[in-house]
Amino acid sequence: MGKDQELLEAARTGNVALVEKLLSGRKGGILGGGSGPLPLSNLLSIWRGPNVNCTDSSGYTALHHAALNGHKDIVLKLLQFEASTNVADNKGYFPIHLAAWKGDVEIVKILIHHGPSHSRVNEQNNENETALHCAAQYGHSEVVAVLLEELTDPTIRNSKLETPLDLAALYGRLRVVKMIISAHPNLMSCNTRKHTPLHLAARNGHKAVVQVLLEAGMDVSCQTEKGSALHEAALFGKVDVVRVLLETGIDANIKDSLGRTVLDILKEHPSQKSLQIATLLQDYLEGVGRSVVLEEEHAQEDTAQETRLSSPAQSPSQKTKSETVTGELSKLLDEIKLCQEKDYSFEDLCHTISDHYLDNLSKISEEELGKNGSQSVRTSSTINLSPGEVEDEEEDPNSCGPTGLWEALTPCNGCRNLGFPMLAQESYPKKRNYPMEIVPSASLDTFPSENENFLCELVDTAVTKKPCSLEIARAPSPRTDNASEVAITAPGTGHHRNSSTGPTPDCSPPSPDTALKNIVKVIRPQPKQRTSIVSSLDFQRMNHNQEYFEISTSTGCTSFTSSPPVSPPTSSVETTEIKNEGAEHTDDLSQQEDDEPPKEYDAGQFAGLLHGSSPACEAPENPFHLYGKRNQGEDGQEEASLANSPLPFKQTPIENNPEPSVKKIKPKVVSRTIFHKRSHQLENHTIVGTRMSRGGSRNGDQWGVNPGGFVERACTLGRIRSLPKALIDMHLSKNVSKSDSDLIAYPSKDKARVNWSKSSTAERSSKDNSERTPSFTSEWEEIDKIMNSIDVGINSELEGMNGEATRPRCPVQTVGQWLESIGLPQYENHLTANGFDNVQFMGSNVMEDQDLLEIGILNSGHRQRILQAIQLLPKMRPIGHDGYHPTSVAEWLDSIELGDYTKAFLINGYTSMDLLKKIWELELINVLKISLIGHRKRILASLGDRLHEDPPQKPPRSITLREPSGNHTPPQLSPSLSQSTYTTGGSLDVPHIIMQGDARRRRNENYFDDIPRSKLERQMAQTGDWGEPSITLRPPNEATASTPVQYWQHHPEKLIFQSCDYKAFYLGSMLIKELRGTESTQDACAKMRANCQKSTEQMKKVPTIILSVSYKGVKFIDAANKNIIAEHEIRNISCAAQDPEDLSTFAYITKDLKSNHHYCHVFTAFDVNLAYEIILTLGQAFEVAYQLALQARKGGHSSTLPESFENKPSKPIPKPRVSIRKSVQIDPSEQKTLANLPWIVEPGQEAKRGINTKYETTIF
């Protein structure tokens, strides 16, 4: 160890000359050494020289010392002599961790790029921290920039569930915070219940960081267990941060998990700081109250000439109004929370709400009812979305209005996601926690006896729009008649005053598919509910900072429309109730509506409508057209949209009937769901729409594009005629069962151009258009001509700029939606888990029947149905088709949406498209470790046909497998693997392919030191599912003195709570008459390989199985049908080892408790590396089980022993087979529970062995 110690000391002190002298006897690396065989003298000097990867007592290698002390030249020299960058010290730190902690950007770059050994940027230490955590915590912005460029995952959480952004915010690293949120803005929404970056920054008083986070769009009202960020800042006395949060509009009434507000916390900690903060809060609340009063007085002056119904919530007296609103909200909130605590049904909750509104209406005085009895009541009640966010037309947008109601209705408190249900709400399936709009209709003097039921059914089912404020807004109808009418007005809008600008959404909205899916989950009411979904076509003065996406549903049609924020003038609207009878329709729907009163019906049909059904009743003579519409001037004035214009229907003349009978007026119902969305975000989204109809013989939707980037559907109002029932039924059969597969992707070529629509819709009328007055008809015909001319011009422009729009395109939908459209949603997990996760890349040249069988779809009828549906999907076009030639590997992978593999390709030497065109599927499996068959098939389909006439040739002699000992011997695979198992037309030589892949992958790198963890574990680490290990494992090299392996493959919790699954070929088992440890495994392996080599037919029968390894043992699972064949307990496994003749073959010995016989089970892995990992995982499973048993024994709780170790008999220690095996001293007291787990490395001395190191484990 003398030279090793000298090397370590020279690296620590920066003595370049001594390092070079000590390592000069070794062969030079890629920077200084030549190629070719080494003379004997050099080999001897290597034997006598120091080990470049030797470690000291703390686990530091020379590279650790050099990186920590900033010796750049030493780092370069060590890498030149093949030092490994992926050796961890005793605390799990890699050299890149130390360089990032020190802030040495040059050394970080060298470790990542220089080679031959390259650092893995996402490697974690024992605290689960990456190098990005170290750099972010200490504010090394240059290092952070380099790591972000190298695709370091910023979502990985350490053992305290902290991301790099959390650490930067906690320690006030402003520049780092800006860099991370600029590169990954989605991190601000990926928070835990323990903390958020905003809470951490507020707690430590980092005012600048708090401002940056809020400016970047972080929700100021986001909550954790400790409440809002205001709680944290107040508790720790950060006055400046409190001031910033209050100015941003945070709700001061938010409560923490203990039910305490900020003022409650201040009372518990009286101090000078608490007094200052309390004063700030008081001034803020008083200022908000004054601003609300001023705006209300201004609003009342504007409406002083209007006739309005009085209400306690709109009293001119400030004190009366404030007390009334506060009292009503308090009572309502208490009852809602009571309903939640007692787990009442949603119907009870809605009944509670409706009772309050009924009470409000009953308070209207008889005097004002007499004055306004001839006026129609327009009532729109909406519910506050989140504290501090009020868009009431009479309140300042930054004021703090009534709070707590929406939090009581939704499980995700404080998340401002305007118009979109949170994903967390799916855990509350019994409560429809989506926005509700309560729209009571008609004058009170018309049918006062029906108010209660009417309000109840409206509350129960009118789930159409997420409101943004709690208000009871009333406005008189501009009409002169007494017809009952209902209107939904956009939040913050009014008929007679300018609207206030409300806050824009802080969260990015989901895709249209996700939105539709969430809506469908909501609009599924309980059966036999009386339902009336009432809304209006009249949306006025919409906020100019937002876009509104509508879902307008009528009896059998759905439109999905994106419209710009417009301000059409007030127009009269007629709405009514409809009767839904599922798929049953009569010849005369209008007569049925006029003759029959409303009945109870199942509104489940609306769920189907939102999936894209087309009109099922009457259609206009001309199809609907899309036309572009832009804002006309900055004053917000806009002509009335045709989509918002009323449709005529027959009713009794109002002039002759002041109090019309409501039952005789049954106009149709149209409901709309409004989604708020940032205007600029739409430009970067994939646009959804319908196929364009070019031919004149087919009536379909057409596309319109305008410079403003907005598209809206409008009805071409021509003659409306009734359709025969047969045509209606045929139309229903074609469209009612349609799913979202009608949605087609049209990538926008210009950010200003947006195409958005849904399948074509049609409006119906109960009577013919001939009953219109002549002037009315002529006006609509004139408008019809104008719209047609606009439509023609727009479509001609679209044809010129988007010529390929008529090409068949792949529907923009998930695999689950596609499977649902063909009636097989149960196979979604089968497809996505195996790489068939994108319908754009699942054409007939990608997926085959054998693939479906392999992934576990055993029903032949279902496979045929899937294959038939796949024929309708577009085939993948190989590179070079249509002149497309990607210039880089990254560009090509991004084009097939497999960009995550970019780094794997580049690291393994696939740096050009020429190399990629020669890649084989075996290389994808063995070299690139692409285990998902769907991704492999996608890659091969994109690369085109394989050149079977040019198979890989014999590898050059320089290709070798590298071992820790430094010896070089060419790998030899078993004859069984070189047979026809993997052959293609008899021309594929498997050993040569694997060695060619190894040549590109390893070059001169250390082969066994750079084994990555499984993909599942990387995902678990990124999501923070693994926390602090519950047990402490000894490293393999400490568990046994004879192994060089320094770290395990998996997190201990993985083997305790889950399992590690590996695919392998099962060659068979052999009865062991005399148990001789690894000698028995060698004999069994040799016999099984000999059996497979006897005939090709025998080799074809070798089954593929899955070994599921955990601390309990090994489950033996059939890979075809996922059935568990057998389960071998850990206590019954006595030995596991690789075969020295073929390291890809391994075996383990189990004991049959019934017969008391031992059997050796033999497997062949896909490559040597996988076999090594399986054996190492088995060893870790033994270690985990052993440590669990020790914990149970030391704690004195025998009942806590794992099941596999209870009543475990002791076993004799077998005699070592090879003399160089180092004995392990074992405490006799520990032998009774579970013995030490030695890992044995036996340097091969026989020339017949392909690789001279094998990995074994033995249980005594």
From Swiss-Prot:
Where composition is biased (Low complexity), the residues are: 556-575, 969-984
Instruction: Identify the Gene3D superfamilies for this entry.
Output: Ankyrin repeat-containing domain (1.25.40.20), Pleckstrin-homology domain (PH domain)/Phosphotyrosine-binding domain (PTB) (2.30.29.30), Transcription Factor, Ets-1 (1.10.150.50)
Subunit structure of this entry? Interacts with EPHA8. Isoform 2 interacts with COIL. Isoform 3 interacts with DLG4.
* Organism encoding this protein: Rattus norvegicus
PID domain spans which residues? 1056-1213
| Compartments, record wording | Cytoplasm
- Entry-linked InterPro entries: ANKS1/Caskin (IPR033635), Ankyrin_rpt (IPR002110), Ankyrin_rpt-contain_sf (IPR036770), PH-like_dom_sf (IPR011993), PTB/PI_dom (IPR006020), SAM (IPR001660), SAM/pointed_sf (IPR013761), SAM_ANKS1_repeat1 (IPR041880)
Residues modified as Phosphoserine are 310-311, 315, 354, 365, 508, 511, 739, 775, 974
SUPFAM superfamilies annotated for this entry? Ankyrin repeat, PH domain-like, SAM/Pointed domain
Query: Motif Nuclear localization signal residues?
Result: 935-938
Compositionally skewed regions (Basic and acidic residues) per UniProt: 576-588
Write the protein's name.
Ankyrin repeat and sterile alpha motif domain-containing protein 1B
ANK repeat coordinates: 2-31, 58-87, 91-120, 127-156, 160-189, 193-222, 225-254
Query: What's a single GO MF annotation on this record?
Result: ephrin receptor binding
Chief location of this protein?
A: cytoplasm
Tissue specificity, in the record's words, reads:
Isoform 3 is brain specific and highly enriched in the postsynaptic densities (PSDs), especially in cortical, striatal and hippocampal PSDs.
- Residue ranges annotated as compositionally biased, kind Polar residues, are 306-326, 372-385
Query: Where are the Phosphothreonine modifications?
Result: 504, 773
In the record, Phosphotyrosine modifications are located at 901, 1007
UniProt keyword Signal, yes or no:
no
Look up the record and give one Gene Ontology term from the biological process aspect. Answer: ephrin receptor signaling pathway
Description of post-translational modifications: Nuclear translocation of isoform 3 requires an NMDAR-dependent proteolytic cleavage. A 35 kDa N-terminal form shuttles to the nucleus.
Summarizing the function annotation, the protein's role is:
Isoform 2 may participate in the regulation of nucleoplasmic coilin protein interactions in neuronal and transformed cells. Isoform 3 can regulate global protein synthesis by altering nucleolar numbers.
Keywords, comma-separated and alphabetical:
ANK repeat, Cell projection, Cytoplasm, Nucleus, Phosphoprotein, Repeat, Synapse
- UniProt keyword Nucleus, yes or no: yes
